Design a protein with these regions (language model features):
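Core catalytic region of metal-dependent phosphoesterases/phosphodiesterases
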Residues: 31-36, 49, 54-151, 225, ...
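Active-site-proximal loop/helix segment associated with metal-binding centers of metalloenzymes
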Residues: 153-249
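Feature marks short, highly hydrophobic, charge-poor N-terminal signal-anchor/signal peptide-like helices
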Residues: 1-11
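Active-site environment of divalent metal-dependent phosphoester hydrolases
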Residues: 53-59, 81-86, 110-118, 147-149, ...
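Beta-strand-turn-beta hairpins that frame and shape the catalytic cleft
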Residues: 36-47, 147-158, 204, 277-282
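Active-site neighborhood of phospho(di)ester-bond hydrolases with catalytic His/Asp-centered motifs
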Residues: 48-50, 74-79, 104-111, 143-144, ...
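Single-pass alpha-helical transmembrane signal-anchor segments in small membrane proteins across taxa
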Residues: 9-21
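Conserved beta-sheet core of the metallophosphoesterase superfamily
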Residues: 95, 103-107, 122-126, 214-297
Length: 297
């Protein structure tokens, strides 16, 4: 009940400031560009949340309580799970979620295949940048790393991907894993070049993981350690437990960027925690308006 009241107040107070930015279809075969404008004269509302891993119950409740519209946009900071199994289960989930009355703007995480590798995605213009989309699911977009998007008049740079802390378990047990889960050198160069063109100034950063100096160390008990403690608490805690070999190169690179760019707010997911450290906002379960007055303080 309390959450419902909060969401209603959020919708009234923080309803957004600009009309929906619309989008254009870009044919992969060089055809004419068709423009589809959702603008009906009322402002779109922009929201943001963290990893979902195929669990969208909160999003469904949010859409129902807030009475969202297709023009409203929910940014998800990676690991949505839409391209996790690479089979019909993914299509079933996309079909179910595409029926929600909202547009999803998704970052690539590390627990899913990249859209460009799936083979069913085209490219479309959206809010000043390019996005991946599937014609069958026209309200589910994936951001392209290194693109700059304009939401409610404010520019955001997007960088997806991270290292999977359970990589060894995935490989041992045959669970889904992708070698290109982290941003590569080409992506990093593209991001740095775009930021330099903007004189290293951007309103916000949208990334899956966070800069190295902001790691939420309290979340770093390994997956195996957690599982062992749940099975046999005393025995597990008395032993020297498994410590994963974690590649922090993405976080280190983001840390270098964070030190040299001028930004107002930085949103990230990945760590399954709702927490703010300085201008870094980590998102998980919370669904909040993209812009709050205190973000500009």
């Amino acid at each position: 009940m309390c959450n419902s009241i909060i969401f209603i107040l959020m919708g009234v107070i923080f309803g957004g400031s600009l009309a929906f930015c619309g989008y254009s279809h870009i044919s992969k075969h060089g055809g004419k560009t068709a423009t589809f404008d959702y603008d009906d004269g009322t402002p779109a509302r922009f929201y943001i949340t963290g990893d979902k891993h195929r669990h969208f119950e909160r999003v469904k409740d949010f859409c129902r309580v807030m009475q969202t519209r297709r023009k409203d946009v929910l940014i998800i900071l990676g690991d949505e799970g839409f391209n996790y199994y690479d089979d019909k289960r993914d299509d079933e989930l996309k079909k179910e979620i595409s029926e929600l009355n909202i547009t999803l703007f998704c970052l690539h995480g590390n627990k899913e295949n990249r859209p460009q590798n799936v083979g069913t995605y085209g490219i479309r213009s959206f809010c000043g940048g390019k996005v991946y989309y599937e014609p069958k699911y026209p309200n589910i977009y994936f951001a392209i790393d290194g693109e700059i998007y304009t939401f409610e008049g404010k520019k955001y740079m997007v960088v997806g991907g991270a290292h999977s802390v359970d990589k060894l378990r995935c490989l041992e047990e045959g669970l889904p894993y992708w070698d290109d889960e982290m941003p590569g050198d080409e992506t990093k160069m593209s991001v740095e070049t775009r930021l330099e063109r903007n004189e290293n100034g951007i309103y916000g950063m949208l990334t899956h993981t966070c800069p190295i100096d902001y790691l939420p160390t309290e979340m770093f008990m390994s997956t195996r350690q957690n599982a062992a403690i749940k099975r046999k608490p005393r025995k597990a805690k008395s032993k020297k437990l498994f410590k994963p070999d974690i590649d922090r190169s993405t976080e280190i690179w983001l840390g270098e960027l964070e030190k040299k760019i001028d930004y107002k707010i930085w949103f990230c997911g990945h760590y399954h925690v709702d927490k703010q450290i300085d201008k870094i906002r980590m998102m998980h379960k919370e669904i909040r308006p993209l812009h709050l007055p205190e973000d500009d303080d």
